[in-house]
């Protein structure tokens, strides 16, 4: 009787181990088809130091893009945080640019396979755990999508969503 139980336990363990390898094949929906960069900027006509010591100056390229839009024109801009996440073939991804805070979250999901010219995304912006924006975005080339966010410390938050370059240029 004891040997039968031991044999049954061993057989059950073997089936579980073998079954686990059979069923754990790669899910093609989890394949990374690109990368998305989400940045949060602080824009103000006042003193940019109120953004805090961790806020970094933005590049001239980003500043030029921001000043190119009438509603985004401010005297100074600071980068508050950035997150780069993979764009998965069939699953949603979440970016958390102000880590460890979850005050600003961006959910995105691919609508189509990315091309060098553009990529279609389902995009949601969440502030303070509330969805405030849902849109179909078409991101192209080096042109980010800017979203004018809420007022903050005498200025405004600007959320930027853009395609990020691949980690390995050859892949």
Question: Residues of each region from the PLM?
Answer:
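Outer membrane pore-forming secretion/assembly proteins and partners of Gram-negative envelopes
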Residues: 2, 25-171
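N-terminal export leaders
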Residues: 3-9
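Cleavable N-terminal signal peptides
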Residues: 11-12, 22
